[in-house]
Amino acid sequence: MAGAGSEARFAGLSLVQLNELLEDEGQLTEMVQKMEETQNVQLNKEMTLASNRSLAEGNLLYQPQLDTLKARLTQKYQELQVLFEAYQIKKTKLDRQSSSASLETLLALLQAEGAKIEEDTENMAEKFLDGELPLDSFIDVYQSKRKLAHMRRVKIEKLQEMVLKGQRLPQALAPLPPRLPELAPTAPLPYPAPEASGPPAVAPRRIPPPPPPVPAGRLATPFTAAMSSGQAVPYPGLQCPPLPPRVGLPTQQGFSSQFVSPYPPPLPQRPPPRLPPHQPGFILQ
């Protein structure tokens, strides 16, 4: 609407009037300020300035709280530096003690301290039962000492587990025993071929060991007497019968006498009767 009115206003002016309007800056500024777009921009600017002012005033209200928090942060940072320095000192001391003491030593010291605090709490309980300590002081001191005793007991158990694990570790990493050398397979004994002819060779009999000496005061047994008298013969000599001859082999020699059977010779038997030749078609009964 404003743009259309300005165009209609400029359309009714002559060229000379337009040139004069261009040269008159005050009139141009007044015309621009009267435009609707310029008025809207000015209104938005004023509203934005008012909003920023209110926000700035609200932020200024937080200035004391911000200063307090800054001072607190500075104080906490200084405390952190102090604690960090104390941590470094304790860590250095702990490393020095850990390098000079073993787990077993620490466990023994901790067990001694645990036994001491247990004894102190028991003595305090006995004094309270005897009426030597008031109730208020007994509750405060006894509770703190029992808490300390419980913490030491837990530390002792954890340290015992660490010691046990430290003792089992070398056993788990112990070298394995050396393996026994494997025996080389023995060569098979040579056996005679099955095609070999002739009787098997007789192996000589092993001589039995001599009998133990008979102590004094005891009679010798017949076996001991026979063995000590001469050559050890475990059984009397007998004349053995000759081996029966084999087909295709000569009779073995070397026996002094022929074997005589103690039984009479068998009676001669009659030959079986002769049967007629077999005829086809008949069954013999």
Swiss-Prot record:
* InterPro entries in alphabetical order: ESCRT_assembly_dom, Helix_hairpin_bin_sf, Mod_r
- BP GO annotations: macroautophagy; membrane fission; multivesicular body assembly; positive regulation of viral budding via host ESCRT complex; protein targeting to membrane; protein targeting to vacuole; protein transport to vacuole involved in ubiquitin-dependent protein catabolic process via the multivesicular body sorting pathway; ubiquitin-dependent protein catabolic process via the multivesicular body sorting pathway
* Family assignment from sequence similarity: Belongs to the VPS37 family.
Renumbered residue ranges of the record's region Disordered: 175-201, 230-285
A GO MF term: calcium-dependent protein binding
Residue ranges of the region described as Interaction with IST1 = 50-170
Q: What does this protein do?
A: Component of the ESCRT-I complex, a regulator of vesicular trafficking process. Required for the sorting of endocytic ubiquitinated cargos into multivesicular bodies. May be involved in cell growth and differentiation.
**Name of the molecule in the record:** Vacuolar protein sorting-associated protein 37B
Classify the protein's membrane topology as the record does: Peripheral membrane protein
